[in-house]
């Protein structure tokens, strides 16, 4: 909104109004605003949650310090959502299709997570919303995002087209054209590109339509997987928020580079017109998650709940899809991936051993993985992996996961220069 106001003032030669033309200025402003909003309103929202007795119900799983968390206000993801929406609405171009998609994603998954937390807190149902309804909500968002990227004329990439002139001396010229494409970015392949159309060569005359169908299905899968991965990661104070902030920095850098022809050419990635506005959103996202850590770091004064975790995961997924970096998610979101896989392996192995031996056995002392480090080894738990034998303090687990997240974020960007 402020962009349009200051654009009008700039036409009237108002001093300083032209600063709002620059994405860097608006991104910096969005970062500062989101930090201020999340810290300023955070305390008030926490007090309100306490007054309404919206506290976390904790099952005794035998984890160190676990029961002390009982009654800590939950649904704090509201703080993150507000701190993202307000700066984005104020600083970004609201007619940008990518910004619109990110705003829809934030509200959509925020509402889904809020409904889940509401059932847990007010209906006294620890399981919350039935899993199938969560999946329907996530799939619905993925379908909307995929179809918009397919149908909107504003969603294009720019590619160099080679034009040859057969004169006495062969002349080759390149010019840039906007095109709809099912290409995405992946390292180690030629030009760092992969086209989903290559998966449907059998489709003949319907190859283009089949490629977009594969792309939409991929969008649905990524949104569902990453939002659930973030949800799994939200088990220790500051873990999900800090990890998401790190991922947000990497995505912001990738969006900036994808929106500038020189940087895109340097990294050999797709040039995406309009993606520069996503840098403003990324700045608000980073500020909101870092500001939330003010209250969520150990010992947490508030938990984000599914209101926050589902939203953070969905935002990361849709953002990566928009800038065509979804195939980098296994590296960038490696923490989410490992947390998710640890649960799937634990459940699958438990069921297999129960069927084969009559009793369920474990791979980890406890899943998701971060809880494995909170359990002592050789404490009567039949698990394939017993190390570490000593309990690792919660704050140390979180910081170590953050450090791994930073390494993965750097690796994600560096891999784009590998040939």
UniProtKB/Swiss-Prot annotation:
Q: How does it sit in the membrane?
A: Multi-pass membrane protein
Q: What is its EC number?
A: 2.7.8.13
Instruction: Enumerate the catalysed reactions.
Output: UDP-N-acetyl-alpha-D-muramoyl-L-alanyl-gamma-D-glutamyl-meso-2,6-diaminopimeloyl-D-alanyl-D-alanine + di-trans,octa-cis-undecaprenyl phosphate = di-trans,octa-cis-undecaprenyl diphospho-N-acetyl-alpha-D-muramoyl-L-alanyl-D-glutamyl-meso-2,6-diaminopimeloyl-D-alanyl-D-alanine + UMP
Look up the signal peptide feature and give its range: none
The cofactors it requires, by name, are: Mg(2+)
Q: Does the keyword Magnesium apply?
A: yes
An example of a Gene Ontology BP annotation on this entry? Answer: cell wall organization
**Keywords per UniProt:** Cell cycle, Cell division, Cell inner membrane, Cell membrane, Cell shape, Cell wall biogenesis/degradation, Magnesium, Membrane, Metal-binding, Peptidoglycan synthesis, Transferase, Transmembrane, Transmembrane helix
PANTHER family linked: PHOSPHO-N-ACETYLMURAMOYL-PENTAPEPTIDE-TRANSFERASE, PHOSPHO-N-ACETYLMURAMOYL-PENTAPEPTIDE-TRANSFERASE HOMOLOG
Q: What is this protein called?
A: Phospho-N-acetylmuramoyl-pentapeptide-transferase
Tell me what organism the protein belongs to: Parabacteroides distasonis (strain ATCC 8503 / DSM 20701 / CIP 104284 / JCM 5825 / NCTC 11152)
Gene name of the record: mraY
């Amino acid at each position: 909104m402020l962009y349009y106001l200051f654009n009008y003032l700039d036409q009237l030669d108002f001093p300083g109004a032209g600063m709002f033309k620059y994405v860097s200025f608006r991104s910096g402003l969005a970062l500062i605003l989101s930090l201020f909003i999340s810290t300023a309103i955070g305390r008030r929202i926490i007090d309100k949650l306490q007054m309404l007795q919206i506290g976390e119900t904790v099952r005794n799983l035998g984890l160190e310090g676990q029961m002390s968390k009982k009654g800590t206000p939950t649904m704090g993801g509201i703080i993150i959502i507000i701190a993202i929406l307000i700066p984005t609405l104020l600083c970004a171009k609201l007619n940008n299709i990518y910004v619109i998609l990110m705003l829809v994603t934030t509200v959509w998954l925020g509402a889904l997570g809020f409904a889940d937390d509401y059932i847990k807190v007010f209906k006294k149902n620890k399981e919350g919303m039935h899993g199938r309804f969560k999946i329907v909500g996530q799939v619905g968002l993925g379908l909307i995002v995929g179809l918009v990227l397919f149908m909107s004329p504003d969603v294009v990439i720019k590619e160099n087209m080679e034009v040859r002139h057969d004169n006495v001396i062969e002349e080759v010229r390149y010019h840039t054209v906007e095109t709809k494409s099912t290409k995405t970015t992946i390292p180690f392949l030629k030009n760092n590109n992969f086209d989903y159309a290559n998966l449907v060569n059998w489709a003949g005359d319907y190859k283009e339509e089949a490629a977009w169908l594969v792309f939409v299905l991929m969008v649905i899968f990524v949104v569902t997987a990453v939002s659930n991965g973030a949800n799994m990661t939200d088990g220790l104070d500051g873990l999900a928020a800090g990890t998401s902030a790190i991922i947000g920095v990497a995505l912001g850098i990738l969006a900036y580079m994808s929106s500038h022809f020189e940087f895109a050419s340097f990294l050999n990635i797709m040039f995406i017109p309009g993606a520069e506005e996503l840098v403003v959103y990324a700045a608000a996202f980073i500020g909101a998650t870092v500001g939330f850590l003010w209250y969520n770091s150990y010992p947490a004064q508030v938990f984000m709940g599914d209101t926050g975790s589902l939203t953070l995961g969905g935002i990361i997924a849709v953002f990566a899809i928009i800038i065509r970096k979804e195939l980098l998610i296994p590296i960038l979101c490696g923490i989410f991936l490992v947390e998710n896989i640890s649960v799937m392996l634990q459940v699958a192995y438990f069921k297999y051993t129960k069927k084969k031996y009559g009793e369920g056995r474990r791979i980890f002392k406890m899943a998701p993985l971060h809880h494995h480090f909170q359990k002592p080894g050789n404490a009567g738990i039949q698990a394939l992996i017993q190390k570490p034998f000593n309990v690792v303090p919660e704050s140390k687990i979180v910081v170590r996961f953050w450090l791994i997240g930073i390494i993965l974020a750097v690796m994600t960007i560096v891999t784009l220069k590998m040939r």
